């Protein structure tokens, strides 16, 4: 997913603590460095106002048996098994900026035809069946 902060106008130096929640459980936080408007986003439409944010940073969030990671760096000890999911479980994913964060710089989520990556949020869920007793 492509993310950035949300400043009045744009400001490349506008940090924001973006929290990731799974089923309303905080799984980690990443600090976006800014709200980028210095150059036009590769896929941002020409009709988009030039003084609005143009692009973000592509981030990969992984939750597995070892913890929660963003771009390969561990951001929390929350593990997938902490959720006790089964085949009937609903999964709700949320991004937010808390009012009590150190950096309350808002959040911009880019999708197809905006920013520098022509994609929506991509989600991959993989699982392993538990061993069977024979």
Where in this protein do the model-derived segments appear?
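Residue-level recognition of well-ordered beta-strand positions that form the cores
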Residues: 2-4, 19-21, 94-96
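Short, well-structured beta-strand segments enriched in hydrophobic/aromatic residues
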Residues: 86-97
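A short beta-strand element within beta-rich, extracytoplasmic domains
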Residues: 2-12
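Intrinsically disordered, low-complexity acidic/polar segments
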Residues: 8-10, 29, 102-104
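Short coil-to-beta strand junction motifs in C2/discoidin
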Residues: 10-22
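Proprotein-processing/basic-patch segments
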Residues: 98-134
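Surface-exposed loop/edge segments in extracytoplasmic proteins
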Residues: 24-30
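Extended, solvent-exposed segments with strong compositional bias
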Residues: 34-87, 103
